[in-house]
UniProtKB/Swiss-Prot annotation:
EC id: 1.1.1.103
Record keywords, A-Z: Mitochondrion, NAD, Oxidoreductase, Transit peptide
Organism: Mus musculus
Protein name, entry field: L-threonine 3-dehydrogenase, mitochondrial
Gene that this polypeptide is encoded by: Tdh
Main localization category: mitochondrion
Locations listed in the record: Mitochondrion
Length: 373
């Protein structure tokens, strides 16, 4: 009935426009939208497109997670501090607050999100607000709200104001029936977590908005991301970050995945660079909306062996979490990212040896071992 009522408004509005000839006809069905707060059927849509010489005005949602602050730093070096606005619903630490513009942004508040985009003349939006795999399974209702309803709000605002939109996807978008070694860009996807389901929804909705409304939607399927200066956010690949904190603290680590569980991984600087590169890529070079990207693939035992080359006394034990193990076994072991490398020149810098050396150096482990020896 809601759709029929809105369709009636469209028909009536068309008739009135023909009769009066006083304004340009707007086709409101184009942006009926998917969010709870639908865009009015008689809305006029404005372009915030910028000249080639003008840097983009950037908004990052969910900016206090594992990737947001690092991405903001990278983009501010590229486009200027004042052109990149970090946002979240949490209070930022002092060093983040003073590093550049920060605003409160609740992606479930459609009106507020719209105001931020308009008031700050946003032309690029990086949507990082999401509950990750393990946390999402413990909070399915909240994950559904944040990962799906929040996405709908972002899609509608981006489409209305002609904003180039990036939303990350994940290895979690694949499922146990997907090819695992390797997983191509296009294959069957039947994930068994709310996080994975929401990311498949993201990929398909973004592609739909691209073809239906012309939204410049871009998406990368991230592998497990390893970062030195941020805490893991509740994902199944978190062990690959936690192991370095443990090595620095006491030289031992208890892993919640089995020793031979192979998953694709990437160092954070490669991840952030790939994100910027795909956003800057000319539209004509992109053959698809969602790309796999990858750098390396390893097991917990292989990571521990690489770590022992720097800290020979490091010890790893295993206490497997059945939930996380089941999730990991449903994910690809290797991602095929040949399309990203071919279309827009993706190339990673960090393999496992470089990753381990960088992480240990950040935590001071390599320095301490060198002094002891």
């Amino acid at each position: 009935m809601l759709f029929l009522g809105m369709l009636k408004q469209v028909v009536n509005g068309t008739a009135q426009s023909k009769a009066s000839s006083c304004r340009k006809l707007v086709l409101p069905l184009k942006f009926l939208g998917t969010s709870q707060h639908r865009i009015p059927a008689d809305a006029n849509f404005h372009s915030t497109s910028i000249s080639e010489a003008e840097p983009p005005r950037v908004l990052i949602t969910g900016g206090l997670g594992q990737l947001g602050v690092g991405l903001a730093n990278l983009l501010r070096k590229r486009f200027g501090k004042d052109n990149v606005i970090l946002s979240d619903i949490r209070k930022p630490p002092a060093h983040v607050f003073h590093s550049g513009p920060f605003v409160y942004a609740n992606i479930l508040d459609y009106k507020s999100l719209r105001e931020i985009v308009v008031n700050h003349r946003i032309s690029w939006l990086f949507h990082y607000s999401a509950l990750l795999s393990a946390v999402g399974e413990a909070n399915v209702s909240l994950a559904r709200d944040v990962n799906i309803t929040g996405l709908h709000n972002v899609l509608d605002v981006a489409a209305e104001y002609n904003v180039r939109l990036f939303v990350p996807s994940t290895i979690g978008a694949f499922g146990p029936t997907s090819p695992r070694n390797p997983a191509p860009d296009l294959c069957i996807q039947r994930p068994r977590t709310i996080y994975g389901v929401s990311k498949v929804h993201t990929e398909l909705m973004g592609e739909y908005y691209y073809y239906r409304y012309g939204l410049d939607f871009r998406c990368l399927r991230y592998p497990g991301i390893i970062s030195a200066d941020s805490q893991p956010g509740g994902g199944t690949t978190d062990y690959a970050v936690q192991i370095f904190h443990a090595a620095a603290k006491n030289g031992t680590f208890e892993c919640n995945l089995e020793a031979g569980t192979r998953l694709p991984m990437m160092y954070i600087s490669d991840c952030l660079r790939a994100t910027l590169e795909v956003m800057e890529a000319p539209a004509e070079r992109l053959s698809m909306r969602t790309y796999n990207i990858s750098a390396m693939s390893f097991t917990p035992e292989e990571l521990a062996q690489a770590l022992r080359k720097h800290a020979p006394d490091f010890q790893i034990t295993y206490c497997v979490d059945p939930l996380r193990q089941a999730i990991a076994e449903s994910w690809p072991m290797i991602l095929d990212d040949s399309n990203a490398r071919k279309d827009w020149g993706w190339k990673h810098d960090f393999d496992l040896p470089e990753l381990v050396a960088t992480m240990l150096n950040f935590h001071g482990v390599s320095t301490r071992v060198a002094q002891v020896n």
